Curated annotation (Swiss-Prot):
Region (Disordered): 122-287, 331-363
GO annotation, biological process: positive regulation of transcription by RNA polymerase II
Record's GO cellular component terms: nucleus
Residue ranges with Low complexity bias: 245-263
Lineage top rank: taxon: Eukaryota
Protein name: Single-stranded DNA-binding protein 4
Molecular-function GO terms, alphabetical: single-stranded DNA binding
Modified residues (N-acetylmethionine): 1
Compartment annotation: Nucleus
Keywords: Acetylation, DNA-binding, Nucleus, Phosphoprotein
Pfam families in the cross-refs: SSDP
């Protein structure tokens, strides 16, 4: 019962326990009338200390009666043995308070709420999350916010983000990929930019679509998240979103927070609808694709691309975009003036308007996440925001 140390050593309480037991046995023998047996017992164990007897029936007898009552009240023995109601209630309470065998066998990491995302899916900067090996650590989201399951009401909407990716738009967040947002030393910028343009190399996935994905200086408009009441991705030509301004002609872009660029922030359709072009729309995997494009409107020349939100709000830029095919073709927009020197960048968009996507070239554009299996786009499907 007690752990033993080396040979001959014992727990200090063992000697006291033996003395107490011998005293209670002697006391029990005296209380039941076995005086000769009690004296013989003391002489055989060589008891030399003074003995103080307790009140009858003695501790040993009282302890045994309580133990036996509880023993008989156990669920598997209560039908065959007599027991008191107190013992039965004690056994029932102990059984109800005992941990479930199923829950007791689960690891600490397996007790997450149903529907919750993995911890790496909301990974913040290093040091902002507890270690996954600490079973006593509370379930916290990025930057110390309490984690809530997206399945329950009031919980945050799960943003569309790559695993192990920091939340975009937050101070201290790491870039999407090493060197993904660094300025290209060979990029000389668009003629209308007035300065060098930063290279945006999308990773193997799509940027997040959520309230945290807007960089500093940009504010998402009301109802900008994908959800009920917003226009779908496959709106017909001429249909524009409720926030579009009739005179804006720029695509908002913010470089103040690494990893905060989300493409044209005109999110529509149900959650999970991709905004970025499909991966199979490229014919040359060695060309660079710069996400700041030049849309051509009716009679419009080369558009201006300010580096911040325009005077008409960040969403005013979407009104100048003419319907583009969802498969990635840019209409009559040109991509001249952009260097094509980085072989590791994303393939350029060079298909003509309405060109069917060649599924055989899916492997060439490996820098985009493949579209969801349940979605299939045809060249006739257009998007206008």
């Amino acid at each position: 019962m007690y752990a033993k140390g080396g040979k001959g050593s014992a727990v200090p309480s063992d000697s006291q326990a033996r003395e107490k037991l011998a005293l209670y046995v002697y006391e029990y023998l005296l209380h039941i009338g076995a005086q000769k047996s009690a004296q013989t017992f003391l002489s055989e164990i060589r008891w030399e200390k003074n003995i103080t007897l307790g009140e009858p029936p003695g501790f040993l007898h009282s302890w045994w009666c309580v133990f036996w009552d509880l023993y008989c009240a156990a669920p598997d023995r209560r039908e065959a043995c007599e027991h008191s109601g107190e013992a039965k209630a004690f056994q029932d309470y102990s059984a109800a308070a005992a941990p479930s065998p199923v829950m007791g066998s689960m690891a600490p990491g397996d007790t997450m709420a149903a529907g919750s995302m993995a911890a790496g899916f909301f990974q913040g900067p290093p040091g902002s999350q507890p270690s996954p090996h600490n079973p006593n650590a509370p379930m916290m989201g990025p930057h110390g916010q309490p984690f809530m399951s997206p399945r329950f009401p009031g919980g945050p909407r799960p943003t569309l983000r790559m695993p192990s990716q920091p939340p975009a738009g937050l101070p201290g967040s790491q870039p999407l990929l090493p060197g993904a947002m660094e300025p290209s030393p060979r990029a000389q910028g668009h003629p209308s930019m007035g300065g060098p343009m930063q290279r945006v190399t999308p990773p193997r996935g799509m940027a997040s679509v959520g309230p945290q994905s807007y960089g500093g200086g940009m504010r998402p408009p009301p109802n900008s998240l994908a959800g009920p009441g917003l226009p779908a991705m496959n709106m017909g030509p001429g249909v524009r979103g409720p926030w579009a301004s009739p005179s804006g002609n720029s695509i908002p872009y913010s470089s103040s927070s690494p990893g905060s660029y989300t493409g044209p922030p005109g999110g529509g359709g149900p959650p999970g609808t991709p905004i970025m072009p499909s991966p199979g729309d490229s014919t040359n995997s060695s060309e660079n694709m710069y996400t700041i494009m030049n849309p051509i409107g009716q009679g419009a020349g080369r558009a201006n691309f300010p580096l911040g939100p325009g005077p008409e709000g960040p969403m005013a830029a979407m009104s100048a975009m003419e319907p583009h095919h969802v498969n990635g073709s840019l209409g009559s927009g040109d991509m001249d003036g952009l260097p094509k020197s980085s072989p590791g960048a994303v393939a350029g968009l060079s298909n003509a308007p309405g060109t069917p996507r060649d599924d055989g070239e899916m492997a060439a554009a490996g820098t985009f996440l493949h579209p969801f299996p349940s979605e299939s786009y045809s060249p006739g499907m257009t998007m206008s925001v």
